[in-house]
Amino acid sequence: MKKIILVFLLLLCLLAAGCAAQPEPIAPELPSDEEETCGPGGPYEMTCRIVTGAKSGTLLLAEHGDALSGVYTLDTQSLSKGILPEEPLQDGQLINVYYGAFTEAWPMNFGGVSSIELVDGGMDDRCALYLRVLEDLWEKDSGLNDGLEVIGVDLSQTSLAPSERSAVAWAFAESHEANLVEGSLEELTEQGYITATPISSTGSGVDLNEPKYYFYSWENGCHFSIIEQPMEDTYSLTPVTFDAQKWRSSLGAYFFSNCTAVQSALGEWSDYTIGSEMIS
């Protein structure tokens, strides 16, 4: 009898190990509104903004909503024509994605996509605008990019939704093969990314025991930020003004000041103008 029990327990352990070795895509919890789903097996629906990739067919998507932070990828090249809308996709569009599951990664990946539909009036390509700004900053004072392994991005002072901020930051860091951290200079200093070295205000070195001044630097990283400024609407167009900064140290930074871009009635943002540029 004991041998039978031991064999039975051994079989249970082998069965559990076999199940654990087969990871499956994670399906989201069903929403409370049953009309939004097609039964317990999906498809599920999610509204996303196309951040980038419409031309290449590899979409980077930001979950739509002021309090949502999901970032997803979707390869439309592998989808049949009946799944895609007839109108070509564009960066900045809102789309509804009907899917069966998503894989746990970052960004997450949609699986079992059965349909993609455009959302009327959802065009807003501000993400693409700010990606251009970050890339333009990257090209300025290229010496600040030397030895760079980490890119810090702070878009918290823009009107982008949390998911859009994360998607833009990820796309920028990924394009330069760098690790990404999000946060302000103050936050990254507190987290230990940025070093604060005390300096003497008198030159004697006496006040280094209780320093009032510090030299800040990031040995293997560079920080990029965009801050929007208030501006009134102009006629039928919607403008935005902003400042942008690239920072490596207290004496190594580049600035775009008083930049302006205008959104058309169709939701597309123009190229931006720079009021002035500064270097330190």
Predicted ranges, named:
Residues 256-280:
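Short beta-strand edge/turn micro-motifs at domain boundaries
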Residues 1-10:
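Positively charged n-region of N-terminal signal peptides that target proteins for export
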Residues 20-29, 33-36, 51-53, 58, ...:
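Flexible low-complexity loop/turn motifs enriched in small/helix-breaking residues
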Residues 82-84:
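Short, solvent-exposed loop/turn positions at domain surfaces
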Residues 103-106:
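Short, solvent-exposed loop/turn segments at the edges of extracellular beta-sandwich modules
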Residues 15-18:
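C-terminal motif of bacterial Sec signal peptides marking the signal peptidase cleavage site
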Residues 38-47, 253-257:
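Short coil-to-beta-strand transition motifs
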